[in-house]
Amino acid sequence: MEERTLVILGATGSIGTQTLDVLKKVKGIRLIGISFHSNLELAFKIVKEFNVKNVAVTGDVEFEDSSINVWKGPHSIEEMLEALKPDITMVAVSGFSGLRAVLSSLEHSKRVCLANKESLVCGGFLVKKKLKEKRTELIPVDSEHSAIFQVIEPEVEKVVLTASGGALRDWEISKIDRARPEDVLRHPVWNMGARITVDSATMVNKAFEVLEAMELFELPFEKIEVKIHREGLVHGAVVLPDGNVKMVVSPPDMRIPISYALFYPRRVALEPFFLRTISLSFEDPDPEKYPAFFLLKEIKDSYALRTAFNAADEVAVEAFLKGRIRFGGIHRVIEKTLEEFQGYPQPRTLDDVERIHFEAIKKAERVTEWLSSTSY
């Protein structure tokens, strides 16, 4: 089998490093390029271990090596992808900047493995337009969307996305508001980055995933359900018209959906999972415990509101992790920011989306400043 070429965007992050783990175990893909933001030490280690000859640096750090092609600056990812035109691009860049990375990956790759949420949440219309133009393969990497991708059929009654409920799922509602960062970062199932772990506790992460599912699978909002599933074994399910339910069950290991996206339609051997005596539970999310998640109905049909929602969450989570606001303040920042964007016209271009994002960042920062100066 001919070796395919791969670029990993965000190679030093959680999904990036787990993608590298897969490459160590399974042959058939050659890593030809990476991007990273600021983890210089790990980037050098990856370059040396995988003999990478192309690097895009998006942060303000100096990467110097005369034997390597290095691109720097805000357009470094686009420039590297245009030069390399890889068979596969793993988009593991986190945050809003992932939207440009995804669009460029779709332009210059044959397959895009998507592990960035914001690109579909904020710019789903742009991603789908580019997909139609280029006919690139888009394979989801999120465990929930990977599961649905594997079992979806032309006609479904419901699609079910599972959620852990986050680190505070068993806390009394009266105490959640004052949870500390160290409490929130103790995720019961997954080992992830800080922002996504906080987003799991607020279930903002699951709100993003509902919006992603709407875009990826062309589903109406009403056909998507979210259930809290404590065991972390069922990643997604589809309810079929004849009463059958198809679900994907596997250990909570991101290397499984990563390998599926990289090697699809071939399944590669990782560690086998054998069924044992297990209990599976499914619960509805509590609106009092997860108020930010239930803003979904308000934002689902507006890319402007979706973009503002994401930007406000980004600001609020950072403020919480730095101790500037309480955990309960995250929802307040999002809600107050969204009020400023009610009736905002739908974006039509990437520039429109970026303008809304930066406007929302500024508004969310003002709300955060106000909250941090009060005892609310």
UniProtKB/Swiss-Prot annotation:
HAMAP family listed in its UniProt record: DXP_reductoisom (MF_00183)
One of the GO biological process terms: isopentenyl diphosphate biosynthetic process, methylerythritol 4-phosphate pathway involved in terpenoid biosynthetic process
Task performed by this protein: Catalyzes the NADPH-dependent rearrangement and reduction of 1-deoxy-D-xylulose-5-phosphate (DXP) to 2-C-methyl-D-erythritol 4-phosphate (MEP).
Family stated for the protein in its record: Belongs to the DXR family.
Keyword Manganese: yes
SUPFAM superfamilies hit by this protein: 1-deoxy-D-xylulose-5-phosphate reductoisomerase, C-terminal domain (SSF69055), Glyceraldehyde-3-phosphate dehydrogenase-like, C-terminal domain (SSF55347), NAD(P)-binding Rossmann-fold domains (SSF51735)
Entry-linked InterPro entries: DXP_reductoisomerase, DXP_reductoisomerase_C, DXP_reductoisomerase_N, DXPR_C, DXPR_C_sf, NAD(P)-bd_dom_sf
Catalytic activity from the UniProt record: 2-C-methyl-D-erythritol 4-phosphate + NADP(+) = 1-deoxy-D-xylulose 5-phosphate + NADPH + H(+)
SS bond list: none
EC number: 1.1.1.267
Keyword presence, rRNA processing: no
Residues that bind Mn(2+): D142, E144, E209
Keywords: Isoprene biosynthesis, Manganese, Metal-binding, NADP, Oxidoreductase
Residues reported to bind 1-deoxy-D-xylulose 5-phosphate: K117, S143, E144, S164, H187, S200, N205, K206, E209
UniProt name for this protein: 1-deoxy-D-xylulose 5-phosphate reductoisomerase
Organism from which the protein derives: Thermotoga petrophila (strain ATCC BAA-488 / DSM 13995 / JCM 10881 / RKU-1)
Pathway, per record: Isoprenoid biosynthesis; isopentenyl diphosphate biosynthesis via DXP pathway; isopentenyl diphosphate from 1-deoxy-D-xylulose 5-phosphate: step 1/6
Binding site for NADPH: T12, G13, S14, I15, N39, N116, E118, G193
Pfam families: DXP_redisom_C, DXP_reductoisom, DXPR_C
Domain of life per record: Bacteria
